[in-house]
């Protein structure tokens, strides 16, 4: 896919001493190139067996077995792939012996800075510019390794990553990176809309389930020259207390239009079943946004993906409590006394909804007294315009579910929502208010003592990734006003 560099086409603006702290993050996750080279070698040794096992697992997925000649394909594929696994095992054991101890020195994320020709967005300078809007996007892409993706009725993760990148690129090119215009005054109640495209003027993008590193790198190649710095390959791998062996990362990927000052990742200590193999946790970053009275303006983003199994609500509640503790710790440790904080945003796939009785504990968690959810009115009460974000897995290959515009039209009607969205786990809505299950959240809060006040202006539910994942993308336009 050709990746035009729209950063070169933007008109540079006078930006003396901006960013205030350039190159704040080291690109490599290792402190020296020798460790990085050894880590790359370990991945090369592991890859043949990883690929063979991945393809073998894909052969046994229910979606493959149910097709015509399904069992014949399963047996034929297994007959070819099993010998490849056996042949690759000696190399894999050497690679594993090298890979495991290297995790001690590995920082839990990779950082890709923008190119040298990159022009940063114009810094925010209140009170001359009293208000500025920031646009956030969250999306669960289900970019699992090929075999695991089949179990979600999806496949071809690398091809889907290319298509997701094309959709993101189209949004970035269309917006041409003008600063998003704000409503004056800000609306008393945020509005919501359903679109077949992604929000324009994206400033921050948080993606979940980008587990496949090859897929992550394809997204990085799109985002870095057209949006800004990217943090990817996030997670703590290797042997953990439990005991667990973490072979998958967190699946988180974060891209920012603004310079990033600091970043950290913390892995949840509690996990069960299939989630025990993944390094789910909280990625926290501090971004530079502008300057007020000679002092820096910063914003905090906290991206996460909670425990998945439906019946494990107690684990999700513990993770939510940990999230709040880690958010407070990160912001307290990194905030300087002279900094003005524009916002603190927590976003991602929380894996519970606001309509199912099975999620009563999560719905009443103190998270919602600390952070504002613009889609939520209360426990089991959503805004009239709010929508579910998880699709019905049995309909993912339907022609309408694979077309952004056709899916958007279908979801405008209750009949379409009931057909293409996943419904509550137990019980049902009244007929006039059926919305589906919203697992994706973008929440925000004002930091006490700050003269900057954030307010939600617009929430967007997007079908732009129709046919590419089992979630709708979700966007938030946040207006920050300097008092």
From Swiss-Prot:
<comment type="pathway">
    <text>Lipid metabolism; sphingolipid metabolism.</text>
</comment>
<keyword id="KW-0472">Membrane</keyword>
<feature type="active site" description="Proton acceptor">
    <location>
        <position position="471"/>
    </location>
</feature>
<feature type="site" description="Important for substrate recognition">
    <location>
        <position position="351"/>
    </location>
</feature>
<feature type="binding site">
    <location>
        <position position="209"/>
    </location>
    <ligand>
        <name>Mg(2+)</name>
    </ligand>
</feature>
<comment type="function">
    <text>Catalyzes the hydrolysis of membrane sphingomyelin to form phosphorylcholine and ceramide.</text>
</comment>
<keyword id="KW-0378">Hydrolase</keyword>
<keyword id="KW-0746">Sphingolipid metabolism</keyword>
<dbReference type="InterPro" id="IPR038772">
    <property type="entry name" value="Sph/SMPD2-like"/>
</dbReference>
<dbReference type="InterPro" id="IPR036691">
    <property type="entry name" value="Endo/exonu/phosph_ase_sf"/>
</dbReference>
<dbReference type="GO" id="GO:0046872">
    <property type="term" value="F:metal ion binding"/>
</dbReference>
<keyword id="KW-1133">Transmembrane helix</keyword>
<dbReference type="GO" id="GO:0005743">
    <property type="term" value="C:mitochondrial inner membrane"/>
</dbReference>
<dbReference type="GO" id="GO:0006685">
    <property type="term" value="P:sphingomyelin catabolic process"/>
</dbReference>
<keyword id="KW-0256">Endoplasmic reticulum</keyword>
<feature type="transmembrane region" description="Helical">
    <location>
        <begin position="80"/>
        <end position="100"/>
    </location>
</feature>
<protein>
    <recommendedName>
        <fullName>Sphingomyelin phosphodiesterase 5</fullName>
        <ecNumber>3.1.4.12</ecNumber>
    </recommendedName>
</protein>
<keyword id="KW-0460">Magnesium</keyword>
<keyword id="KW-0496">Mitochondrion</keyword>
<keyword id="KW-0735">Signal-anchor</keyword>
<dbReference type="GO" id="GO:0005576">
    <property type="term" value="C:extracellular region"/>
</dbReference>
<dbReference type="InterPro" id="IPR017766">
    <property type="entry name" value="Sphingomyelinase/PLipase_C"/>
</dbReference>
<dbReference type="GO" id="GO:0031966">
    <property type="term" value="C:mitochondrial membrane"/>
</dbReference>
<dbReference type="GO" id="GO:0004767">
    <property type="term" value="F:sphingomyelin phosphodiesterase activity"/>
</dbReference>
<keyword id="KW-0443">Lipid metabolism</keyword>
<keyword id="KW-0479">Metal-binding</keyword>
<feature type="region of interest" description="Disordered">
    <location>
        <begin position="1"/>
        <end position="20"/>
    </location>
</feature>
<keyword id="KW-0809">Transit peptide</keyword>
<dbReference type="GO" id="GO:0005739">
    <property type="term" value="C:mitochondrion"/>
</dbReference>
<dbReference type="GO" id="GO:0046513">
    <property type="term" value="P:ceramide biosynthetic process"/>
</dbReference>
<dbReference type="GO" id="GO:0005789">
    <property type="term" value="C:endoplasmic reticulum membrane"/>
</dbReference>
<keyword id="KW-0812">Transmembrane</keyword>
<comment type="similarity">
    <text>Belongs to the neutral sphingomyelinase family.</text>
</comment>
<keyword id="KW-0999">Mitochondrion inner membrane</keyword>
<dbReference type="GO" id="GO:0006672">
    <property type="term" value="P:ceramide metabolic process"/>
</dbReference>
């Amino acid at each position: 896919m050709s990746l035009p560099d729209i950063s070169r086409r933007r008109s540079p603006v006078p930006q003396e001493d901006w960013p205030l702290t350039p190159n704040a993050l080291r690109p490599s996750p290792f402190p020296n190139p020798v460790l990085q080279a050894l880590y790359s070698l370990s991945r090369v040794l592991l890859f043949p067996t990883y690929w063979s096992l991945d393809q073998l697992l894909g052969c046994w997925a229910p979606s493959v077995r149910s097709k015509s000649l399904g069992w014949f394909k399963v047996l034929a594929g297994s007959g070819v792939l099993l010998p490849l696994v056996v042949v690759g095992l000696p190399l894999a054991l050497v690679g594993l012996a090298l890979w495991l101890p290297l995790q001690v020195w590995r920082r839990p994320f990779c950082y890709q800075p923008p190119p040298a020709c990159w022009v940063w967005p114009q810094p925010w300078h209140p009170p001359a510019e009293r208000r500025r809007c920031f646009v956030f996007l969250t999306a669960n892409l289900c970019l699992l390794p090929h075999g695991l993706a089949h179990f979600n009725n999806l496949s071809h993760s690398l091809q889907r990553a290319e298509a997701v990148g094309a959709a993101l690129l189209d949004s970035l090119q269309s917006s041409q990176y003008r600063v998003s215009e704000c409503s004056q005054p800000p609306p008393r109640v945020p509005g919501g809309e359903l679109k077949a495209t992604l929000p324009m003027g994206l400033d921050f993008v948080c993606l979940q389930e980008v587990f496949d590193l090859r897929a992550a790198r394809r997204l990085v190649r799109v985002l870095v020259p057209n949006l800004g710095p990217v943090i990817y390959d996030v997670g703590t791998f290797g042997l953990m207390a439990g005991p667990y062996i973490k072979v998958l990362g967190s699946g988180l990927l974060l891209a920012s239009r603004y310079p990033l000052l600091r970043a950290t990742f913390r892995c949840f200590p509690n996990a069960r079943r299939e989630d025990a193999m993944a390094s789910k946790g909280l990625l926290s970053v501090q971004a530079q946004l502008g300057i007020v009275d000679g002092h820096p303006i910063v914003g905090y983003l906290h991206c996460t993906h909670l425990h998945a199994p439906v019946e494990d609500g107690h684990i999700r509640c513990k993770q939510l409590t940990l999230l709040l503790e880690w958010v407070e710790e990160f912001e307290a440790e990194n905030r300087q006394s002279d900094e003005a904080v524009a916002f603190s945003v927590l976003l991602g796939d929380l894996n519970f909804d606001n309509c199912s009785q099975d999620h009563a504990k999560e719905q009443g968690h103190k998270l919602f007294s600390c952070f504002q959810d613009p889609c939520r009115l209360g426990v089991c009460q959503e805004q009239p315009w709010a929508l579910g974000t998880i699709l019905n897995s049995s309909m993912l290959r339907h022609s309408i579910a694979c077309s952004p515009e056709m899916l958007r039209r279908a979801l405008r009607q209750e009949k379409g929502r009931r057909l293409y969205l996943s419904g509550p786990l137990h019980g049902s809505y009244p007929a006039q208010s059926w919305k589906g299950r919203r697992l994706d959240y973008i929440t925000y809060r004002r930091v006490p003592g700050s003269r900057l006040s954030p307010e939600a202006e617009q929430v967007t539910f997007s079908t732009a990734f129709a046919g590419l994942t089992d979630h709708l993308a979700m966007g938030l336009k946040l207006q920050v006003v300097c008092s």
